[in-house]
Amino acid sequence: GPFAWTCNDATLKKGRTIAAGVGVFNLTGQAAGINKGRTMAAGTGAYTLTGNAALIEAARSLPAGTGVFTLTGNTVAFNSEANLPGGTGSFIFTGNNAGLRVSRLLSSGVGSFTLTGNAANLNRGKSMPAGAGVFTFTGNAVTFLRGRVMPAGVGAFTLSGQSAGLRKASIIGINAGAYTLSGEPVDFRIGGVLVAGHGSFVFTGNAATFRATRQMPVTVGVFVLTGNPAGLLNGNKLSGDAGAFVLTGNAAAIYV
């Protein structure tokens, strides 16, 4: 059946459980959210949370076999230990501060994952494992910070924004995929690694560079670096059995 909660404080508090075989779950209001220990388990359903503070806080879980999960609002975020496991689904996070915070996990067999907003990023310990999916991160400060990992069998990874880059120990490892990083200072910093069997790697921006100890080992790939100072600095390596390597810009060079 359909389940609807509407009021100024439409929330599920401690120990609440909604279990149904088939249903539509709508939570709307000034503070429409699922708090600690909340569970909404259903075989098939659409889950919509809207409001000024529509978010899932610590230890939130929405398990479903098939479903569409939409979270919108001014502060739409997953806080610590947020988990959305599902067999098939579309996961959309939009808002001014649409991001995954500490220990966020989105695991599904097939899905489309879109995070948009002014500060759409993955912070420490973020993981998005999926068999097949499209991963899009857009915003003013779209970055992967330390220890970010996005393992997937097949996927397209797009990072764009003012400072779209991979910083220390950032890793994107997949079997097949297209990797696009664009923005003002688009670069791989110390320890940046992109490992893939097949892939197309495109880096565009004013400062699209590989800095010290950058490495991109692939079997087959197209590598394009464009920008005003598009170059490989010392210690940088691009190794591949077959590939097209294009470096363009005002100072497109490989340094010592």
Can you say where each PLM-predicted feature lies in the sequence?
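Intrinsically disordered, compositionally biased repeat/linker segments
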Residues: 1-256
